[in-house]
């Protein structure tokens, strides 16, 4: 009851007391001035330092992003150049292979023509030799035939014997 009597005498908790309001305001201003002198500067400087740190981090992040994009562009350019270079190398390789194939085909064709010409020359020489041998044999046969004709008379039986003899001689010379 004592507490309720004090509350009733002072006018209650919700009724304003001008002295209390004054001293509360004075105390608040004094605490505010003390905080401003002692704590406000360090708090503001800490906030400013934190803001600078955050801004620096943001700037570094943008810088890193820009650098990464530049590296990405450079890598893409290098990849495109490498693709072009590989296409050029492949194209040159194909061209070289085709040129080499063509040169080899031309060389083989030249060698074949050379071999054919050599074979034709050899055949022609063999043909000449065979004709020479044949001429010699025909001349020998003609001479032998003429000798036999001169030595014997020319009746039908004699002629037949001479021809048969010449054929046998020719056959024996060939073997």
From Swiss-Prot:
Q: Which InterPro entries match?
A: ATP_synth_B-like_membr_sf, ATP_synth_b/b'su_bac/chlpt, ATP_synth_F0_bsu_bac, ATP_synthase_B_chain
Entry keyword Cell cycle? no
> Can you tell me where the transmembrane regions are?
20-40
Q: Which residues form the signal peptide?
A: none
Subcellular location, record wording: Cell inner membrane
Q: Which GO terms describe its molecular function?
A: proton-transporting ATP synthase activity, rotational mechanism; proton-transporting ATPase activity, rotational mechanism
Cellular component (GO) terms are: plasma membrane; proton-transporting ATP synthase complex
This protein's membrane topology, according to the annotation, is: Single-pass membrane protein
CDD domains, per the entry: ATP-synt_Fo_b
Q: What does this protein do?
A: F(1)F(0) ATP synthase produces ATP from ADP in the presence of a proton or sodium gradient. F-type ATPases consist of two structural domains, F(1) containing the extramembraneous catalytic core and F(0) containing the membrane proton channel, linked together by a central stalk and a peripheral stalk. During catalysis, ATP synthesis in the catalytic domain of F(1) is coupled via a rotary mechanism of the central stalk subunits to proton translocation.
Q: Which family does it belong to?
A: Belongs to the ATPase B chain family.
Stored PANTHER family: ATP SYNTHASE SUBUNIT B, ATP SYNTHASE SUBUNIT B', CHLOROPLASTIC
Question: Its quaternary structure?
Answer: F-type ATPases have 2 components, F(1) - the catalytic core - and F(0) - the membrane proton channel. F(1) has five subunits: alpha(3), beta(3), gamma(1), delta(1), epsilon(1). F(0) has four main subunits: a(1), b(2) and c(10-14). The alpha and beta chains form an alternating ring which encloses part of the gamma chain. F(1) is attached to F(0) by a central stalk formed by the gamma and epsilon chains, while a peripheral stalk is formed by the delta and b chains.
The record's listing under NCBIfam families reads: ATP_synt_b, PRK14472.1
**Record's protein name:** ATP synthase subunit b
Q: Which organism is it from?
A: Chlorobium limicola (strain DSM 245 / NBRC 103803 / 6330)
């Amino acid at each position: 009851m004592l507490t309720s009597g004090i509350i009733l005498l002072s006018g209650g908790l919700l009724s304003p007391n001008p002295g209390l309001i004054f001293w509360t305001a004075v105390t608040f201003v004094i605490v505010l001035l003390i905080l401003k002198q002692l704590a406000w500067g360090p708090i503001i400087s800490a906030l400013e330092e934190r803001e600078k740190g955050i801004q620096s981090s943001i700037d570094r992040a943008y810088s890193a992003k820009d650098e990464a994009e530049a590296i990405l562009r450079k890598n893409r350019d290098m990849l495109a150049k490498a693709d072009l270079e590989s296409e050029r190398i492949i194209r040159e390789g194909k061209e070289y292979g085709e040129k080499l194939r063509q040169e080899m085909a031309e060389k083989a064709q030249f060698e074949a023509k050379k071999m054919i010409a050599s074979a034709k020359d050899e055949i022609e020489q063999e043909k000449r030799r065979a004709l020479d041998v044949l001429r010699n044999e025909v001349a020998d046969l003609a001479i032998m035939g003429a000798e036999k004709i001169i030595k014997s008379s020319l009746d039908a039986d004699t002629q037949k014997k001479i021809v048969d003899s010449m054929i046998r001689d020719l056959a024996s010379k060939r073997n």
